[in-house]
Regions:
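Cys/His-rich microdomains that often coordinate metals
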Residues: 24-32, 49-52
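Short glycine-rich substrate-engagement loop in P-loop NTPases that contacts/grips substrate
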Residues: 102-110, 145-189, 208
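Walker B catalytic acidic pair
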Residues: 196-198
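Interdomain "pre-motor" coupling segment immediately N-terminal to P-loop NTPase/helicase cores
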Residues: 36-84
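Short cysteine-rich clusters marking metal-coordination/redox-active sites
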Residues: 17-23, 45-48
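Walker A/P-loop nucleotide-binding motif
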Residues: 119-141
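N-terminal pre-Walker A segment at the start of P-loop NTPase domains
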Residues: 93-118
Length: 272
C-alpha cells in the first residue's frame, strides 16, 4: 500500500550533528521530532539505544530505553489518529457540563464507551453522537480516541466525511497516490474509526456519491466486526439520507449506542 493520505505522522525538523560521550560512539545524526503535546524532542544516540535494548546492561538503563521506545510509538500512534491541535487537549474532564443533565449524560455515555472499549471492540459496537453544531461532539469523540490509544494501544483515526470523499475523488484523478481500494482498506483496518461532520453537505438525489461511499466504509467495518463512531448534526430520522438506510441499520445493530447532544452551541468561549 502507498503512503497514507489519512493518517498523519509527526513532523521532523532538519537533522543536525550531535556528539555522544559514550566510549566509541562519537558523533551521530540527530533530528527534532514533533510531539503530540506541541513540543519538539531531539533523537538520542542510536548506538546507546541499540546497546540498551540488545546487550547486557544495567536494568534501569534497559528499562529507560524500552520506556523511550514506547513513548515514541505512542506519539506516532496519537499523531496517526488525525486529531488536530485544537482538539489534542480534549479529555472527559475538560468537557464542561455545568451540571446540565443532558451534558452529563452525553459525557457519561462517551466515557463508558472508552472505558469499556475492549467489550465494544469485540462486539464491533458503534456509537453515534448526534446533535446541534458546536456542542462538544468532536471534543468527546477525541477524548474517546485518545483514551483507547493510550490505554489499549489501539489504532484509531478521526476523519471528516468530506475528507474521505475528497481522498477517494483524488484517487480517481491520479495514479501516483493511494487507490480507492487502498483508502477503504485503511479505513477498515484501524481499531476505531471516527467519521466526523456527516450530513454537512446538501444531498442530491440520484447524483450524490457520499451516501454510497459512507455506506461502503461503514459496511466494510461491520463485516470485519470493528467499531465505528459517527458524528452528525442530523437526527436519527434524517441521518439515513446521508449514509443510506442499510448503513444506519449497521450502526444500530448489536446494541449500537447513541449519545444525544440536545443543547445549543458551546463554541463561544470553549472548544466544541
Amino acid at each position: 500500500m502507498t503512503s497514507s493520505k489519512l493518517r498523519p505522522a509527526p513532523g521532523e525538523r532538519a537533522p543536525g550533528i550531535a556528539k555522544c560521550e559514550a566510549p566509541g560512539h562519537g558523533q551521530y545524526e540527530t533530528k527534532q521530532v514533533e510531539q503530540f503535546d506541541g513540543g519538539w524532542k531531539a533523537t538520542d544516540c542510536p548506538r546507546c539505544r541499540w546497546e540498551a535494548l540488545n546487550l547486557q546492561c544495567d536494568a534501569s538503563v534497559r528499562d529507560a530505553a524500552y520506556a523511550e521506545r514506547e513513548a515514541e510509538e505512542l506519539n506516532r500512534d496519537l499523531f496517526a489518529t488525525g486529531i488536530t491541535p485544537r482538539f489534542r487537549g480534549c479529555t472527559f474532564d475538560t468537557f464542561i457540563t455545568n451540571a446540565d443533565s443532558a451534558k452529563v449524560r452525553a459525557q457519561s455515555i462517551c466515557r463508558r464507551y472508552a472505558e469499556e472499549f475492549e467489550d465494544h471492540y469485540r462486539a464491533g459496537r458503534a456509537l453515534m453522537l448526534l446533535g446541534e453544531v458546536g456542542n462538544g461532539k468532536t471534543h468527546l469523540a477525541c477524548a474517546i480516541l485518545q483514551h483507547v490509544v493510550r490505554e489499549y494501544a489501539a489504532k484509531g483515526l478521526i476523519v471528516t466525511a468530506e475528507a474521505i470523499m475528497q481522498a477517494v475523488t483524488d484517487s480517481f484523478r491520479s495514479n501516483a497516490g493511494p487507490s480507492k481500494s487502498d483508502l477503504l482498506a485503511e479505513l477498515a483496518a484501524v481499531d476505531l474509526l471516527v467519521i466526523d461532520e456527516v450530513g454537512m453537505h446538501t444531498p442530491r438525489p440520484g447524483k450524490d456519491f457520499m451516501p454510497s461511499l459512507l455506506h461502503e466504509v461503514i459496511d466494510r467495518r461491520y463485516q470485519l466486526v470493528r467499531p465505528t463512531i459517527l458524528i452528525s448534526n442530523q437526527d436519527r430520522e434524517q441521518l439515513p439520507a446521508f449514509i443510506g438506510p442499510r448503513a444506519m441499520d449497521r450502526l444500530r445493530e448489536n446494541g449500537g449506542l447513541l449519545a444525544p447532544f440536545t443543547w445549543s452551541s458551546a463554541r463561544v468561549g470553549g472548544v466544541a
